């Protein structure tokens, strides 16, 4: 079936239930960024495969909202579907709550699966539509009725992450969180986020591609903890370990029953941005809801010394693999056929040679030529194209190791470049180097740092429509908060001070539709630089260790400071990576990291 036929079936179900709109989000029951196959309802209905987007279906129309990363991709994939693309944040584009207010009649009904809608999102819709007395119908998943061959819920084995990687024991983490609960006046903490449950319990799983988590909820009290999980996913050994730390098991779907049974006067802590609407609706009226940012977010974001050291080890392994890949790509292009997809598979095979490699950390982006202008392009058998010995290839990839999570982008010259390609590459590199060299007082937020990366681009009248940096989990999600580097303060719901031990990305870019794209990305860890009478200064240490492409640099555009930073980084790369290379690969790395001189 095509999207037109699928939407017709959904509308038939809506009509039976007298629904005036049906909302289908990207999320699973846990507000995860990446979701298992069972939860890809929006993709099933619309054909749009991006990782962010919301579909609203009306009786005679449909619209899909997505952000700037996916404007080009969505416009292509929605063609012929009858679904209007709503470019979020652009002039004249309504937000979803306002759209629903304007298109649903007085006393109408909006349907959705309340397990997939966050409390915050439901509240925002309710506030906008209240004046028209519009009601919610959230008890039924209508997509399930039209998706005949829907994949089952994943139920892969849960495994333990050794404390030598995590740095803190399960008991220590539980005590930390309970201390925060006490400070916040909460007697119960409902934890629906898969990465938070995994981090807190030092457990990992394989229920979500690219993110080592398992389907679960945790109900935490001062003296007890109940893990709602698919029982067959937990071995007897792990269950015994959990029990010894005061954690008991319950069926996965029991979370709603357990919340509904909370006694009168219970003060329930939950994060409305992450808790689904059905959880909130399950809280008894006699209990009090404390809608607060989860304290686990910041705990998880500030990496332990053990996590930081393990991430350094992971990035050396990853740096070796990506360096070998770039060498292979540059020396094979034009001699053997290479497609975007075959290059992607080659890089994965090189990473898999590393000890303790688990999986990729997201769908790899290997984008040649004009595909590089599609910010989150993913090559497939249908879309992948041959690469030629000219122009640029943008490679944004990452991996999961037992020692940590990686995310790197390198834009590689495959042969001769135009002056425009070199100019754009060099401007992006300058912004990347300037942010990487930041030294700043504690108390700064990502919004304070963002302009360092954008200034060389803004001076040239250029910009990019995505964040400059995102937090990265430890053997968890490649994108996490609360830290974020972005200039647009209006978009930020929650602001976060940059703390020592945080790991985030530094990834400016430029995308010229129909031509090419350039992005350069390192992960950095925040460290203390110095303390003096003015305060505590922080700096950024690069974790990613892979050379930039000298063949793509217009040296005339570099300042003396740029050259100093470039040479210092390349010296660090050579020192870390060269012991693991030999022969032609080592000779190439020597040449790729030789100091640059500008007359």
Name what the model sees in each region.
Residues 1-599:
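Active-site neighborhoods and metal-handling regions in enzymes and metal-associated proteins
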């Amino acid at each position: 079936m095509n999207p037109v036929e699928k939407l017709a079936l959904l509308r038939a179900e809506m009509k039976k239930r007298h629904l005036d709109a049906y909302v289908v989000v990207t999320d699973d029951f846990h507000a995860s960024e990446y979701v298992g196959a069972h939860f890809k309802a929006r993709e099933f209905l619309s054909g749009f495969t991006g990782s962010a987007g919301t579909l609203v279906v009306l009786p005679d129309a449909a619209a899909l909202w997505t952000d700037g990363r996916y404007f080009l991709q969505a416009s292509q994939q929605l063609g012929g579907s009858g679904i209007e693309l709503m470019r979020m944040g652009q002039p004249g584009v309504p937000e979803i709550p306002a759209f629903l207010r304007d298109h649903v009649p007085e006393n109408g009904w909006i349907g959705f699966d309340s397990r997939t809608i966050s409390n915050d999102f439901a509240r925002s819709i309710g506030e906008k539509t209240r004046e028209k007395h519009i009601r919610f119908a959230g008890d039924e998943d209508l997509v399930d009725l039209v998706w005949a061959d829907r994949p089952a819920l994943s139920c892969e084995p849960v495994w333990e992450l050794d404390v030598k990687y995590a740095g803190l024991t399960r008991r220590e983490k539980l005590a930390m969180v309970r201390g925060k609960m006490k400070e916040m006046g909460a007697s119960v903490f409902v934890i629906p986020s898969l990465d938070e449950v995994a981090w807190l319990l030092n457990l990992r799983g394989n229920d979500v591609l690219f993110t080592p988590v398992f389907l679960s909820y945790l109900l935490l009290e001062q003296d007890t903890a109940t893990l709602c999980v698919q029982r067959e996913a937990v071995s007897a050994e792990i269950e015994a370990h959990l029990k010894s730390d005061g954690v008991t098991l319950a069926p996965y779907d029991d979370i709603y029953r357990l919340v509904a049974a909370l006694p009168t006067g219970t003060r329930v802590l939950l994060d409305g941005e992450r808790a689904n609407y059905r959880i909130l609706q399950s809280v008894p009226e006699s209990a009090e809801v404390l809608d607060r940012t989860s304290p686990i977010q910041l705990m998880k974001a500030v990496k332990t010394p053990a996590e930081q050291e393990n991430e350094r080890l992971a990035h050396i392994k990853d740096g070796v693999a990506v360096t070998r890949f770039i060498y292979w790509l540059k020396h094979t292009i034009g001699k053997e056929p290479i497609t975007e997809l075959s290059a992607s598979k080659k890089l994965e095979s090189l990473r898999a040679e590393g000890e303790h490699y688990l999986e990729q950390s997201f769908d790899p982006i290997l984008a040649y030529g004009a595909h590089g202008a599609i910010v989150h392009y993913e090559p497939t058998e249908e879309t992948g194209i041959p690469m030629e010995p000219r122009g640029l290839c943008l490679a944004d990839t990452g991996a999961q190791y037992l020692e940590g999570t990686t995310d790197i982008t390198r834009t590689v010259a495959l042969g001769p470049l135009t002056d425009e390609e070199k100019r754009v590459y060099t401007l992006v590199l300058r912004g990347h180097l300037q942010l990487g060299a930041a030294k700043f007082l504690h108390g700064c937020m990502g919004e304070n740092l963002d302009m360092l990366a954008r200034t060389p681009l803004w001076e040239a009248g250029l910009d990019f429509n995505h964040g400059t940096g995102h937090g990265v989990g430890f053997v968890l999600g490649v994108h996490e908060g609360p830290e974020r580097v972005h200039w647009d303060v209006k978009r930020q719901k929650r602001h976060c001070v940059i703390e020592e031990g945080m790991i985030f990305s530094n990834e400016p870019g430029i995308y010229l539709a129909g031509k090419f794209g350039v992005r350069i990305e390192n992960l950095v860890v925040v460290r203390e630089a110095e303390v003096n009478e003015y305060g505590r200064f922080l700096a950024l240490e690069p974790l990613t260790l892979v050379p930039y492409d000298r063949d793509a640099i217009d040296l005339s555009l570099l300042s003396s400071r740029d050259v100093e930073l470039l040479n210092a980084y390349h010296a660090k790369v050579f020192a870390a990576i060269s012991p693991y290379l030999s022969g032609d690969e080592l000779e190439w790395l020597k040449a790729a990291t030789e100091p640059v001189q500008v007359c």
